[in-house]
């Protein structure tokens, strides 16, 4: 059978519906015929299930539509994994904006209206606006045409950690940290604030983020109060400090303990359920704090995810806008 290009779709005449849509979920019915998206037509040409499109075989068809190559690679891979795949065209799928394909659960087709994955195709050299993620799968195609799937979500970040007793401590601001000489033991043991300087009962050193939060909540007394600590933080980091402080405070308010994630290349590693430092488990998340409009390359996203996976943690981006609202986006590897 041969197709004909019309209004950006490939029309296949009589018997097209039965052969392509009814039996295998390709395209959308058009009477007894079927209308195929170009990527579907390319796949059928590659399989030999479609003879030509306006006389063109696969080579000529791809040459005529060069921007089709990368989506074709993803479509082919998903089809060969056993999925029915609908191109995300208006009128074909619901909520089509921002995606390229809807992947139906195995055993289902476009007539079922079910969704396993909403897929966006990204070239390795492209860019990803992080606040557009959260309900899509990124299908990243590298320069050797290998595929990496990254699943994104908007997680609920919360825990049960906190201080049960009202505590107070005095501190001294020294360069980029605060030192507490006689801090209550529970501040560290139960709240996991700071680090002991030299031994179990030694002075407690707090990061500027920890000190700013404790000063703002009335736990820590320091010359100049929270404002002095925050000013020192801005001197050291600029606006980045304010974003990180917003995320730090929010995590603490939600019962999550944030600690430095420096050795993992992140802003924080987090613990959701801290009862005591002596019984501390592994951290669950790596958190990078970025502006709300942050854009990263697929390579950078993949590196973050790979590192988090390698240390058995989940990668989360905390996107902070000018009003201190936070959008949480998690990204992880996916094998469809």
From Swiss-Prot:
Q: Name one GO molecular function term.
A: tRNA-intron endonuclease activity
* InterPro entries per the UniProt record, alphabetical: tRNA_endonuc-like_dom_sf, tRNA_intron_Endo_cat-like_sf, tRNA_intron_Endonuc_cat-like, tRNA_intron_Endonuc_N, tRNA_intron_Endonuc_N_sf, tRNA_splic, tRNA_splic_arch_long
**Natural source organism:** Natronomonas pharaonis (strain ATCC 35678 / DSM 2160 / CIP 103997 / JCM 8858 / NBRC 14720 / NCIMB 2260 / Gabara)
| EC main group | lyase
The function of this protein is: Endonuclease that removes tRNA introns. Cleaves pre-tRNA at the 5'- and 3'-splice sites to release the intron. The products are an intron and two tRNA half-molecules bearing 2',3' cyclic phosphate and 5'-OH termini. Recognizes a pseudosymmetric substrate in which 2 bulged loops of 3 bases are separated by a stem of 4 bp.
Catalysed reaction(s) here are:
pretRNA = a 3'-half-tRNA molecule with a 5'-OH end + a 5'-half-tRNA molecule with a 2',3'-cyclic phosphate end + an intron with a 2',3'-cyclic phosphate and a 5'-hydroxyl terminus
Q: Which UniProt keywords apply?
A: Lyase, tRNA processing
State the protein's name: tRNA-splicing endonuclease
What PANTHER family does its record include?
Answer: TRNA-SPLICING ENDONUCLEASE SUBUNIT SEN34 (PTHR13070:SF0), TRNA-SPLICING ENDONUCLEASE SUBUNIT SEN34-RELATED (PTHR13070)
Report which gene this protein is encoded by. Answer: endA
